[in-house]
Every structure is written in C-alpha cells, then in structure tokens.
Amino acid sequence: MQKYVCSVCGYVYDPADGEPDDPIDPGTGFEDLPEDWVCPVCGVDKDLFEPES
C-alpha cells in the first residue's frame, strides 16, 4: 500500500501501521481515511499529503 507524506511537517502515514492514536486500524488506505482526518503531528488537512516517492 502507498505511503503518504505531509508536505508541511514530513509525517508519513503508513497504511500498514494505521494510526493507533486516532484510532485508524492497520490496513486502512489513505483514500479510506475519514474526510475530516488531519495530520496527527501538525493538524493540516489530508489534501496537503502527497504520495511518498
């Protein structure tokens, strides 16, 4: 699964790990995150994330 990087702070969302503090289950693809999900580090919207190259 594709990892996504926050263009503001560099946080990497890895679908294999999910986001346990949110709670987002492991295996949840970036496109399946809730629309109101924000970066857990800096709080920006998910539209400021880019696929990791």
UniProtKB/Swiss-Prot annotation:
SUPFAM superfamilies assigned to the protein according to its UniProt record, in alphabetical order: Rubredoxin-like
GO molecular function: electron transfer activity; iron ion binding
GO biological processes: alkane catabolic process
Domain Rubredoxin-like: from-to ranges: 1-53
List of residues binding Fe cation: C6, C9, C39, C42
Pfam families noted in UniProt: Rubredoxin (PF00301)
Name listed for the protein in its UniProt record: Rubredoxin
Annotated organism of origin: Chlorobaculum thiosulfatiphilum (Chlorobium limicola f.sp. thiosulfatophilum)
